[in-house]
Amino acid sequence: MRLHWNDLGAPRAEQACGKTVELSGFPLTVLPTGSADHFLMMAEPGCCQGCVPANRLAVIEVFADQPLRLGTGRLRLTGTWQVSPDPDGWRYQLRGAEVKPGVTRRALMAASPLFCLPAPAMAQAADGTAVDIHSHAGNLIPVSFGRGQFSAVAEPMRQGGVSTICLAIVADSPTIKLTGGRLRPSRDPRPGELYEWSRRAFEQLHALAREQGLPILRTSAELGAARASRPSLIVSSEGADFLEDRIERLDEAYQRWALRHLQLTHYRPNELGDIQTEPSVHDGLTPFGAEVIRRCNQMGVVVDVAHGTYDLVKKAAAVTTKPLVLSHTSLTGRPEPWTRRILPEHARAIAATGGVIGIWPVTAYFPNIVAYAEGFAKMAELVGIDHVGLGTDQLGLVGPSALPSYADLPQLAAALRGKFTADETAKLLGGNYRRVFQASLG
């Protein structure tokens, strides 16, 4: 028996209890994993563990006799359908679940453009000038917590033709955690806590740069000259929480840590404004947030409004005199609760400042390189070729990535060349951000 998602909550789903059924959906686990014997399945992909529908009729709880390989996209399952009487649990369960074998026509059609590309296109990266505008590469987040060691950054960048990455510390890390399936603020920070945390994280970032021979860029001229033969970093912070309402700390980060790219918010509504994944408390951007934007404009720091609400973005656009960046997201055509994706009007607000929107390779939305390239194409069609960039969130995604290594960038470049000219592809993979960096730093 084949079930469809619009059957849930209807008599057909109730009548299927005890029967063998088949259905397709997107898996969601509490923690990132390649296989599991217990997980949730949803009709639409979520960008992170936070994207769980509150409606108990909109999710299927899956139980398997052995771990199932989850893959990176839509999963076809068969099993015994059960209707749970537990009022506090999910209404529908799939027991004894197994993966339905076979290659779908859709998957084959999605991958087929790469089969037709000439060998030179597959082998050629952007041209050695690619820039990733949002990254946590090098195992930076775990190392900041004292876990593990740095992983290779420079060599994969050279292999893939990536000249520069905006390498970000995570300023609110000590105060966020996975709660109820969502990354959320877990407590208020202690006075001075996030400043001290960020200071140590900046130290780790600089240590990684020294260890792997990665120059830290401080001027637009340096970025203009950057090439993949000698990969480099731009110091970034995901969240301005380390400021703790003290504007002079922005000057300190600029001078001491070479901060040149600042994302205002992350996973806690902070002193600068509201975020997409929590209820609004500031009506968008705060007066302090506006002050930080003005100071960034004066000093020469790129302003990144990723994670901020649409109200925050509108107010930021009214304040800034320089282009805004929204470093990692993708386009959605409908409002979604707590999503990190953005609606067309949100994207247009960034483009209207002359800014750039980074497309991230979340496999729930883009299960392969060809689909990822289509994400670039859809955004470019909406806002124009000059306002789209590469924002991989390398080693920061809670799930798999369609671009797991910088060494894979030639595949993305080849897929983009199936949709864009060589010059347009170069803009998408770095040229547009280079323009914004130049405009911001002078």
Segments predicted by a language model, with ranges:
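OB-fold and OB-like single-stranded nucleic-acid-recognition modules
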Residues: 1-107, 112, 122, 366-369
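Short, well-ordered secondary-structure micro-motifs
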Residues: 52, 316, 336-339, 369-370, ...
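N-terminal signal peptide c-region/cleavage motif recognized by signal peptidases
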Residues: 118-120
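Extended, charged catalytic domains and RNA/DNA-binding interfaces, predominantly
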Residues: 122-360, 364-366, 376-380, 387, ...
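Conserved active-site loop/cleft motifs that coordinate metal ions or position small ligands
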Residues: 166, 388-391, 426-429
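Short acidic/histidine-rich active-site segments
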Residues: 360-361, 383-403
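Outer-membrane beta-barrel pore domains
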Residues: 369, 397-399, 416-419
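Mid-to-C-terminal alpha-helical segments outside catalytic/metal-binding sites
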Residues: 404-442
